[in-house]
Amino acid sequence: DVNGNADVSGTLDVDGNVRVVGSMSKGSGSFKIDHPLESKKETHHLVHSFIEGPQADLIYRGKVDLVDGKAVVNIDQIARMTEGTFESLNRNIQCFTSNETDWDVVKGSVSGNKLTIECQNTNSTATVSWMVVGERDDQHMKDTDWTHPDGKIIMEPLKEIVQE
């Protein structure tokens, strides 16, 4: 039990939950979980940085130049993850594209770990910004006590009432 300030230099490892009553400031934040691929679960972790929001979303983004009106992006490669990690880690995937070069219409779709971007103009060489958002679907997310059984964050949990 610590009253007042506790200063830690180096790394503080906690096995269990940490609860902060009051504000918390951090220079950065991330999750570090067992790798979701069976072949790496015993030998590797998977690390992602956080973005705060009402869902446990993972965001992948980048830019690509179209060739003959099309581009295919391997999300695992772009994120420097092992092939299959994106599919193991995400569900309810959404894709957003924006043509930065001209007014030609572009659209994107994701199948597996491949983002395919197509332009209405099949000769386009436009530069397209893209963003893919998926909800975390790893076992750690399902096992926490701050998510519903479907993995969605419990946004308005009941307060714990302390009996004296």
PLM regions with names:
Residues D7, D13, N17-E164:
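Extracellular receptor-binding modules and their adjoining Ser/Thr/Gly/Asp/Asn-rich linkers
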